[in-house]
Swiss-Prot record:
This is Cyclin-H. Associates primarily with CDK7 and MAT1 to form the CAK complex. CAK can further associate with the core-TFIIH to form the TFIIH basal transcription factor. It comes from Bos taurus. The keyword Transcription regulation applies. The gene is CCNH. Belongs to the cyclin family. Cyclin C subfamily.
Length: 320
């Protein structure tokens, strides 16, 4: 249960400001570590600023979702949600300048498959990468190298509570206890879209899975012109507890605002920041504390297979 979970105790935070402080601390700690090794000065332009790290994390998190969406065999939604949560948690306390998000995102997906018991072998997993067999083998070596690091940085808190199960639970509840809504399934598509958009934000680090699921359903109802206030007051028994109802409405409003204000990173900005990031991970600077095999760092192309049509129509290196 979520309320007794490590997710509630250790990975649900009070505010966006708290998340910003954690990320800024991770950025500062890495800079201090890099300066201490004598290769750079404190204000060296090679360093990424916290807001630049956030931009890169947004980009690679979207890449992670895209990788999972075309994965063969089809990856369950809970596995995708777990992988994304691992990625978010990892970069609360670590810098992209130390651990490259390209390999971390793959390690998150790989570990999520194991934890959520999605039966896929290591060769099957790397078979989804757009790489030669040798390249896939080397990438797997990297993933296995980083797997224990990832587990340690997650403080061994590997069970993730996603909003997808409570979402299905609310739909069942609407069907059985809320006759005013004749066909709750009409809410599913728009609610699913909301869940996809909220996954790109920090909502999973700020709100409970049931709050996210309920907000998705009520947002869908609102867009369809359906009023469901009576569901909150009658079916969820909040009529007599106006304080709890008011708090819930405030939470849902802030979550919708979080989704509304999310801005995907601009391609030109990402391109410039990726160049800056690669310099941090270059062999001559070697700012990253643990030097890894270089394969997998130089090129984004290996992250997902192309279709045969794409292989014919687009040159290597044009993926996303």
């Amino acid at each position: 249960m979520y309320h007794n979970s490590s997710q509630k105790r250790h990975w649900t935070f009070a505010s966006e400001e708290q998340l910003a402080r954690l990320r800024a601390d991770a950025n500062r700690k890495f800079k201090c570590k890099a300066v201490a090794n004598g290769k750079v000065l404190p204000n060296d332009p090679v360093f990424l600023e916290p807001h630049e790290e956030i931009t890169l994390c947004k980009y690679y998190e979207k890449r992670l979702l895209e990788f999972c969406s075309v994965f063969k065999p089809a990856m369950p939604r809970s596995v995708v949600g777990t992988a994304c949560m691992y990625f978010k948690r990892f970069y609360l306390n670590n810098s992209v300048m130390e651990y490259h998000p390209r390999i971390i995102m793959l390690t998150c997906a790989f570990l999520a498959c194991k934890v959520d018991e999605f039966n896929v072998s290591s060769p099957q997993f790397v078979g989804n990468l757009r790489e030669s067999p040798l390249g896939q083998e080397k990438t797997l070596e990297q993933i296995l190298e980083y797997e224990l690091l990832l587990i340690q940085q997650l403080n061994f808190h590997l069970i993730v509570h996603n909003p997808y199960r409570p979402f299905e639970g609310f739909l069942i509840d609407l069907k059985t206890r809320y006759p005013l809504l004749e066909n709750p399934e009409i809410l599913r598509k728009t609610a699913d879209d909301f869940l996809n958009r909220v996954a790109l934000t920090d909502a999973h680090l700020l709100y409970t899975p049931s709050q996210i699921a309920l907000t998705a359903i009520l947002s869908s109802a609102s867009r369809a012109g359906i009023t469901m206030e009576s569901y909150l007051s009658e079916s969820l028994m909040l009529k007599e507890n106006r304080t709890s109802l008011s708090q819930l409405l405030d939470i849902m409003k802030s979550m919708r605002n979080l989704v509304k204000k999310y801005e995907p990173p601009r391609p030109e900005e990402v391109a410039a920041l990726k160049q800056k990031l690669e310099r941090c991970h270059s062999a001559e600077l070697a700012l990253n504390v643990v030097t890894k095999k270089r394969k997998g760092y130089e090129d984004d192309d290996y992250v997902s297979k192309k279709s045969k049509h794409e292989e014919v129509c687009s040159p290597k290196g044009s993926f996303m």
